[in-house]
């Protein structure tokens, strides 16, 4: 089974360097264009999906609707971006100015509990629930419209062995981990075969 993780297009929060979190922000005009473009790329590859999921946050649902307009997706909260609590909607630069080092340290640890959000363990736990769910379902090709943080979390769990019961499985595409940028509307392909996950393509349409 192949899992295509597709990041949403540029959102209003992306365009202002703000925390989005679970706020229902929309795509920008640029983001809408990115969504249509990735749909064209998928069609050029003759890719069809047995099942499609999307985060239940607006920017991911909009991306699905624009990229694959003649398809239906199941919404799920399990692949939402990390919950940043009351930081949602606030510009990162303003948070730095106001809170300084304590904020930067928490952000670096991916720990937003101070503001009523999640930490990294909580975030990964619900994403892993989604992964374990799709392992049990029928279908050879699955798409999930989600968020950059979700995609990086899946990658981290692959490198750490969490996805594979403690067995790290190296990437087979010749890219070092620090090189893994995750642009808006990037497409990232993971494969589950014989009980193990592998990374098959990172940002597959990158020029």
PLM regions and their residue ranges:
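Short glycine/proline- and acidic residue-enriched helix-loop micro-motifs
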Residues: 101-122
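Short active-site segment of divalent metal-dependent hydrolases/proteases
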Residues: 11, 150-151
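Acidic, low-complexity terminal tails and accessory targeting/binding regions
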Residues: 76, 82-94, 156-207
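Glycine-rich phosphate-binding loop signature in dinucleotide/nucleotide-binding domains
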Residues: 45-48, 134-140
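Loop-to-helix element that buttresses phosphate recognition and phosphoryl-transfer chemistry
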Residues: 3-62, 118-127
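Active-site catalytic microenvironments for nucleophilic, acid-base chemistry
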Residues: 41, 66, 70, 133, ...
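Phosphate-coordination/substrate-recognition cap region in phosphate-metabolizing enzymes
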Residues: 37-104
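Generic beta-sheet signal
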Residues: 3, 140-148
């Amino acid at each position: 089974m192949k899992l295509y993780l597709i990041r949403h297009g540029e959102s209003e929060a992306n365009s202002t360097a703000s925390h989005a979190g679970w706020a229902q922000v929309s795509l920008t005009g640029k983001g809408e264009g990115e969504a249509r473009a990735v749909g064209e790329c998928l069609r050029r590859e003759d890719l069809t999906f047995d099942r499609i999921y999307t985060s239940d946050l607006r920017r991911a649902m909009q991306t699905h609707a624009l990229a694959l307009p003649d398809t239906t997706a199941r919404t799920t909260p399990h692949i939402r971006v990390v919950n940043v609590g009351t930081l949602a909607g606030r510009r990162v630069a303003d948070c730095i100015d106001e809170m300084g080092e304590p904020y930067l340290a928490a952000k670096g640890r991916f720990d937003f509990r101070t503001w009523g959000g999640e930490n990294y363990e909580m975030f990964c736990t619900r994403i892993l629930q989604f992964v374990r769910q799709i392992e049990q379902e029928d279908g050879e090709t699955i798409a999930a419209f989600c968020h950059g943080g979700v995609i990086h979390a899946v990658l981290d769990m692959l490198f750490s062995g969490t996805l594979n019961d403690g067995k790290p499985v190296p990437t087979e595409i010749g890219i070092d981990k620090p090189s893994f940028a995750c642009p808006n509307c990037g497409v990232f392909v993971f494969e589950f075969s014989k009980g193990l996950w592998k990374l098959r393509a990172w940002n597959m349409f990158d020029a």
